[in-house]
């Protein structure tokens, strides 16, 4: 349908896949495969996203787009749980961060508190500026604290979640009599 085609074009553009459409999936780089997987998920219009290392292979430019996509999804009511070793990305885009060790959550807080109070698992910006700016966890924090101006993120192309399709009619199935269930189990 026209609506599906329009939606597909929107997601392909958002995930910067236009130039890849004629290529075989085996010819895509790891980052391109991640973008294609993201597009596939976005087309499903999920209510919950469970992401495992979603930034692996993504270039810095698309990580920023991906972060904006996550913020847009969250603002529209999508629940997002992400497992990642990409500390810089988590510091910038996560609402809460946690550290797992030996199968347990050892510590958990909002990103600024989590990364500024952690000497082992923290961002490069925090390691560099820790003695002067202990609360700085992103390069943008350091730039702003030094009086510089941080460029606003580029606008995300128009993206909206499509409402879910109307639920299909459900048919009620007649229950089998007990004797038929027993007969089915025996045969």
What do these predicted regions represent?
Residues 121-186:
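ABC ATPase nucleotide-binding domains
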Residues 90-92:
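A short, surface-exposed alpha-helical micro-motif characterized by mixed small hydrophobic
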Residues 49-52:
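Catalytic Walker B motif of ABC-type/P-loop ATPase nucleotide-binding domains
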């Amino acid at each position: 349908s026209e609506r599906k085609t329009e939606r597909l074009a929107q997601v392909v553009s958002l995930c910067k896949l236009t130039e890849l459409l004629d290529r075989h999936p085996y010819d895509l780089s790891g980052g391109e495969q991640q973008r294609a997987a993201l597009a596939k998920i976005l087309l499903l219009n999920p209510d919950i996203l469970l992401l495992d290392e979603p930034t692996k292979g993504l270039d810095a430019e698309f990580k920023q787009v991906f972060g904006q996509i996550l913020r847009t999804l969250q603002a529209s009511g999508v629940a997002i749980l992400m497992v990642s070793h990409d500390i810089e990305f988590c510091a910038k885009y996560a609402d809460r961060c946690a550290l797992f060790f030996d199968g347990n959550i050892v510590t958990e807080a909002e990103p600024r508190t989590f990364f500024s109070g952690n000497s082992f698992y923290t961002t490069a910006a925090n390691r560099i500026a820790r003695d002067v700016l202990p609360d700085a966890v992103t390069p943008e924090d350091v730039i702003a604290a030094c009086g510089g101006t941080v460029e606003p993120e580029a606008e995300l192309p128009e993206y909206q979640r499509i409402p879910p399709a109307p639920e299909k009619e459900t048919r009620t199935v007649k229950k089998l009599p007990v004797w038929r269930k027993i007969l089915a189990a025996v045969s």
